[in-house]
């Protein structure tokens, strides 16, 4: 019995609080665990398999399902901000004669199974390089996905202002209060509809317009026409300063301009911040713009998701591009007209003074009235830019607008190469980048009753110079047909407008502010004091009164001296 082996019972670890051992041996302490799959193939020590297996079916043969997604033990070097510098990584456009040159070098060299070909040695290496380049591109995409999702950055940063910080058009003050039902999000507004809105009644027509020169319809990229600056006066008068609207107060209870109404109708497409002042006087509503606002400036690239435009972009900042686009639009709308051929309406332009009578821009104002139901009578001042002869010799009213090219490297489409042969692609790109602006123009034309909407394509002569431009072509649309092409639903537009009017009509007399949030798809309606935005005007009035009083005192003193 003494020579037999003795059985020693092993130590059993009982973990009453969970599953697994209670303690970790010192030999295995602090060893990280790498997740893996037993289905992975062995042979991953060096990842050279991408260039060996040129057939795409075997490109991911040894790729682990845990390999790319798990970055637990990856090494990340701390960023040294002192050595940070900006690098231009934008792709330069190749000249036409250098494009697709690799395609001809590979002819007969690389096939799927790498067999045959006159230049097989050279072409085979090219195929391996292409596969390696494909793997690098795939890895870059994976790293980008990890940064966007794993680093806390949302995929929709670009849509929510990730490219540059947008600011509100007006600073919200503490005493301003949002109405109880005054926060309207875009998804809810996009579901509203007001169908079967009757045709409007034209109450008043005034002004004079010139005829459109059809020679500009034949302009192409091969016979460009320089854009010439036109010295003409454009009146952008707000609603409450319009003398004609004051005469029509008895015929309606909601008053606005076409620019304000189209902004509200197409608000679900806007990304930039804007604001509109609403005044409730008795039973009437007046929609106004602020005097010191940028409401009348045209936006550029407002709805683009892939354009890196910010206030540090040199000449291509949002403010500079907006001023440039407005300058181009005004000059183009007057340059394409025939001098001397004028159509005068029944009443003169109400905003013209004796000083600028000879330099006023070609414009016709039509005051139109819509019945929106439930006692809502809307009167809008609409505008036409020109007049032209239709295909049957009839007289047609026209609205003239301009799209401008400022940098083809940013937009991805070179107008000088694509405008004549692929005009649809150019317009599609502009619709993607400037959807809100095009929708506003279309809504303006429909409100005014224009038969045609003329679009001009204007580009910089030198993309580093914002002072010289050239006309590359024009395009003509029927407003309602164009609204269908750009998916502008006028029933929804009327529904959005009616919803905002109803909310404002429920409020007592006073002043409201409609503000588009700069970073969210939301508009808010604030209740603001009646004296808001009027301090400067009151100060000016007080100064004028003081000057008049001083003059009166001086005259009195002079009279006393004579006595």
Curated annotation (Swiss-Prot):
Region listing for Disordered, in residue ranges? 95-136, 528-563
Question: In UniProt terms, what function does this protein have?
Answer: mRNA cap-binding component of the eukaryotic translation initiation factor 3 (eIF-3) complex, which is involved in protein synthesis of a specialized repertoire of mRNAs and, together with other initiation factors, stimulates binding of mRNA and methionyl-tRNAi to the 40S ribosome. The eIF-3 complex specifically targets and initiates translation of a subset of mRNAs involved in cell proliferation. In the eIF-3 complex, eif3d specifically recognizes and binds the 7-methylguanosine cap of a subset of mRNAs.
The entry's localization annotation reads: Cytoplasm
Sequence ranges of Acidic residues compositional bias: 534-563
Q: What is the lineage of its organism?
A: Eukaryota, Metazoa, Cnidaria, Anthozoa, Hexacorallia
Q: Is RNA-binding there in the keyword field?
A: yes
What are the protein's GO molecular function terms? mRNA cap binding; translation initiation factor activity
Instruction: Give the record's subunit note.
Output: Component of the eukaryotic translation initiation factor 3 (eIF-3) complex.
Q: Where is this region: RNA gate?
A: 294-308
Q: What is known of its domains?
A: The RNA gate region regulates mRNA cap recognition to prevent promiscuous mRNA-binding before assembly of eif3d into the full eukaryotic translation initiation factor 3 (eIF-3) complex.
Q: Name one GO cellular component term.
A: eukaryotic translation initiation factor 3 complex
UniProt lists the family membership as follows: Belongs to the eIF-3 subunit D family.
Q: Which domain of life is it from?
A: Eukaryota
One GO BP on record is:
formation of cytoplasmic translation initiation complex
Cystine bridges: which residues?
none
The source organism is Nematostella vectensis
Query: InterPro entries recorded for this chain?
Result: eIF3d (IPR007783)
Q: What name has this protein been given in UniProt?
A: Eukaryotic translation initiation factor 3 subunit D
Keyword Cytoplasm attached = yes
Q: Which UniProt keywords apply?
A: Cytoplasm, Initiation factor, Protein biosynthesis, RNA-binding
